[in-house]
Amino acid sequence: MSKEKFERTKPHVNVGTIGHVDHGKTTLTAAITTVLAKHYGGAARAFDQIDNAPEEKARGITINTSHVEYDTPTRHYAHVDCPGHADYVKNMITGAAQMDGAILVVAATDGPMPQTREHILLGRQVGVPYIIVFLNKCDMVDDEELLELVEMEVRELLSQYDFPGDDTPIVRGSALQALNGVAEWEEKILELANHLDTYIPEPQRAIDQPFLLPIEDVFSISGRGTVVTGRVERGIIRTGEEVEIVGIKATTKTTVTGVEMFRKLLDEGRAGENVGALLRGTKREEIERGQVLAKPGSITPHTDFESEVYVLSKEEGGRHTPFFKGYRPQFYFRTTDVTGTIELPEGVEMVMPGDNIKMTVSLIHPIAMDQGLRFAIREGGRTVGAGVVAKIIK
């Protein structure tokens, strides 16, 4: 089959497999690529190609991740699979592989296990919006009642973490039998693909979201005023539009009187572009790196939040010793460091390098944030942890 060219016409959706070790996540990933390639075209990927995951670096953290892609008639999917449990934790917290939806793999022979629960909880904390369940190894369970029991347990577990357990699609299948080409089990993979197409809504592209530009630099240009530069994170900014300057100090409003890129004037700056924005009547000293320009009312500044954090191990260049409550590192948001103090969950005295932990953070300055914002934890300029805002407190 000749190599197909990448079609930009189909909506692009990011998904991934999650679930307990040895429940069949990688086998399922291989089965999806194989069955969909057979029915709809595209490349099949063998189990060992996926299992042998390359190392990647995200925010200074080493993660083993496999990326595969596949197509259904209506969509193009990018799918991420991780070999080890620690890789999942890091992946989800750093947002290295943002997921529009996840496929939770549960072996019907075991039912939900500790990591099943942990991955669902992590999914809730880091903002995975949709979960579809693949009940695997159903070819090894003859008892219909047992399957129903496992299904019920999974639904209860999802509901416990605020996912709609009763309405979640659950597919009963066998990844291994589908991979081996057994028709009745291949059907189950097509059923799963159909749920991906219908249950996970098309993600909103960055360009369609409200405008946000993290400020990297501020210049004063004589006779013209103040220019801030940075990469537009989302949305579009047009000359003449009103924006808010949010974070660190009290929020203020101003008007963008010009947008430029490589010293050329533009009508607008779009998500992904590095631009300079000329601001009306704003003094150089009123703005600093670490603030954001945003569509008015779209984002607010906060100091206190709950977060899910992964603490780098010594081997990853992290701390060599644990830390305790009252620890005061820097929290790096977008373009700047802000000092903050931490509170640990009840009953947790200390946090070891390599742990993942839920912690409450209180910053000394407010930062423009919403749920799902990623940050790094730093000490003297080196990264010692990565986290995500799970819930804003104030």
Curated annotation (Swiss-Prot):
Q: Which Pfam families match?
A: GTP_EFTU, GTP_EFTU_D2, GTP_EFTU_D3
Instruction: Recite the UniProt keywords alphabetically.
Output: Cytoplasm, Elongation factor, GTP-binding, Hydrolase, Magnesium, Metal-binding, Nucleotide-binding, Protein biosynthesis
Q: Where are the transmembrane segments?
A: none
Where is this protein found? Cytoplasm
Annotated region G1: the residues are 19-26
One Gene Ontology term, aspect cellular component: cytosol
Q: Where this protein primarily resides, as one coarse class?
A: cytoplasm
The Enzyme Commission number assigned here is 3.6.5.3
Q: Where is this region: G2?
A: 60-64
Give all residue intervals belonging to the tr-type G domain: 10-204
- State the residue spans of region: G5: 174-176
- The residues the record assigns to binding GTP are 19-26, 81-85, 136-139
Q: What does this protein do?
A: GTP hydrolase that promotes the GTP-dependent binding of aminoacyl-tRNA to the A-site of ribosomes during protein biosynthesis.
Protein family membership: Belongs to the TRAFAC class translation factor GTPase superfamily. Classic translation factor GTPase family. EF-Tu/EF-1A subfamily.
Subunit organization: Monomer.
Name used for this protein in its record = Elongation factor Tu-A
